Amino acid sequence: MKLLAVRRLFRIQRVVIRYRLDDLLFALPLPWWMLAVRFVLPWRWLPRRKSELSRGVRFRLALQDLGPIFIKFGQLLSTRRDLLPEDIADELMLLQDRVPPFDQQVAINLIEEQLGARICDVFSRFDETPLASASVAQVHAACLKTGEEVVVKVVRPGLKPVIGQDLAWLFILARMAERVSADARLLHPVQVVMDYEKTIYDELDLLREAANSSQLRRNFEGSDLLYVPQVYWDWCRPKVLVMERIYGLQVTDMAGLADQRTDMKLLAERGVEIFFTQIFRDSFFHADMHPGNIFVSTVNPWSPKYIAIDCGIVGSLTPEDQDYLARNLFAFFKRDYRRVAQLHIDSGWVPAETKLNEFEAAIRTVCEPIFEKPLKDISFGQVLMRLFQTARRFNMEVQPQLVLLQKTLLNIEGLGRQLYPDLDLWSTAQPYLERWMRERVSPKTLFGNLQSQVEQLPHIAGMTRDLLERMSRPHASDPPRPWHERKDEPVLRLIGAALLVGGAIQGWVMSEAATQLLTLTAWPAAIMLIAGLYLIVRR
C-alpha cells in the first residue's frame, strides 16, 4: 500500500511538472520561504517551451491526466465559482467524466454476487456491452423476467482503495495550503475536500441513489413537468441499481427537438418551474442536473415533459433557508441592498457582528452594475454567485446546501437560455415565488405551524425539569463565577422571561379547559413560572 502511495505521488509530481502547475502555486501570495522553494526545484532551471495554453486549460488537462477521482473533484470545484477565478471555473465545467468500461464478465460476476442470483434467473435479456461508462459506475440495458425494460447500474470494483489514496493526497495538499496562505484559509480547502469526500462516497452507495430517485418520483407523481424512472427495489443493492429504462431526446439535441416541433419557450419555462417547485414546495432538489442527466419526452411535444435520471446528488433547504432565499431575491430585484445585507446577517450566513453599512455598500458595489442589463438578461445564478463572493469577504460560513443550489440554478438557467435565448427567468419565477410567500402566511399554514408548536407543549415540563436539575448540581472542580460576572446572564434572563410569559399563557389556556383536565395540565405551567422567576431574580 505504501509503495502504491509513493508511486501515486510521483505520478502527481510528473503531471504538475508537465503542465507547470507550480506557476499557479507561486502566483499566490505565499510566505517568503515558500517562494524561495522555486529556486531549488530542478525543472525550473531547465529551458522551457512557451506554452500557448492558458492556466485554466493546463489545470483542466492536468486533472484529466490524474484520472477519474481528480476529474470528479474538478467537477465539484467548477461549482464553487465563489472560490475560483472565472477562467479556471469555466474550464473545469468542460471536464467530462468518461472512462473506458471495465470487463463485461467482471460486471456480470459483481451483479450476480450482489443479487445472490444468476443473471439468467433475473433477466430475460442482459446486454453485456454497456450503454454508458463513467468513473464510479457503468450502465447495462436489460429486460426483467416480468417483461419490464430496465437499466442496470453497477459500481466499478476496487474503487474504495483508489479513492482513499487520492483523497489522502488531496487532504495533504489542502492542509498545506491552509497553513502557508491566509488567502487559502479564507477558501476553506480542507472543508472543500471534506465535502467532496462525502459526495464521492455517497455516489458509491446505489441504495442512496435509489431512495433519492423514489423520493423525487413521488414528489412529481402525475405531474406534467417532470418524469422520474421507477426503481425496482427487489433488485437494488449497495452496488447494483435496477430502474426503468427511459426513452427520450437528450435535452441538448436541438435538431431532434426541432424535428418533433417541441414548444421550446414552454420547455425552457417548465425547467425553471421544476427548479422552484423542488426548492420551495418540496425542499428536495436534484443537484446534478447537467445536460447528460436530463431528457425530453417524445410524447406531446407541444406540452413537453422533462425526464430526470441519476439522483446520486440531492440537496435540501430548511424552511428558514427557503424564506431567507426568497426574501433575498425579492430584495435584490428591488435594489434594496440594505435588506439583502440584513437578511444575510439575520439568517446566520454571515457573523452577527458584521457592520451592516459596510456590508450594504459592498453588495451595492458588486450588484449595481448587473442592473445595467435588461431584466431578462440578468442571471439568477450570477446574482447568487456575486452575493456569495461578497459575503465571503465578510466571513460568510460555507453553506453546502446553498452551494448545491447555486450549481443547480446555473445548470438550469444555462440550459433554459440554450433552449430559448429570450427566457426571462425573473418573470417566470416571480409569480411562483409570490404564490409561495402568500401560502407561507395563509391561515392554513399558520394553523399547521401552531398545531406543531402545541404538540411540543408536553415536552416543555420535562425540558424545564432537566434545566433546573443541571443548574442545581454542584460544580465539583470548577466553581461557577458570581452570577453578576457571567457572560450568559442576559441570555439566561431572556430565557427566564420567555418561560415566565409562556407559563402565564399556558396557565391561562389551561384555565379555560374543563375542570378535570386542569389538575392534570396545570403543573407544567407552574414549573415554567417558577423556573422563569428563578432565572430572572437570581443573584
From Swiss-Prot:
InterPro entries: ABC1_dom (IPR004147), Kinase-like_dom_sf (IPR011009), UbiB (IPR010232), UbiB_bact (IPR045308), UbiB_kinase (IPR050154). Its main location: membrane. One of its GO terms (cellular component) is plasma membrane. It is an enzyme of class 2 (transferase). It is a multi-pass membrane protein. The chain crosses the membrane at residues 23-43, 494-514, 517-537. It holds the Pfam family ABC1. The active site is at D288. Its EC number is 2.7.-.-. It is found in: Cell inner membrane. GO terms for biological process: regulation of ubiquinone biosynthetic process; ubiquinone biosynthetic process. ATP binds at L131, A132, S133, A134, S135, V136, A137, Q138, V139, K153. Pathway: Cofactor biosynthesis; ubiquinone biosynthesis [regulation]. It comes from the Bacteria. Keywords: ATP-binding, Cell inner membrane, Cell membrane, Kinase, Membrane, Nucleotide-binding, Transferase, Transmembrane, Transmembrane helix, Ubiquinone biosynthesis. Residues 125-492 form the Protein kinase domain. One of its GO terms (molecular function) is ATP binding. Belongs to the ABC1 family. UbiB subfamily. PANTHER family: CHAPERONE-ACTIVITY OF BC1 COMPLEX CABC1 -RELATED, PROTEIN ACTIVITY OF BC1 COMPLEX KINASE 7, CHLOROPLASTIC. NCBIfam families: PRK04750.1, UbiB. Is probably a protein kinase regulator of UbiI activity which is involved in aerobic coenzyme Q (ubiquinone) biosynthesis. This is Probable protein kinase UbiB. The lineage of its organism: Bacteria, Pseudomonadati, Pseudomonadota, Gammaproteobacteria, Pseudomonadales.
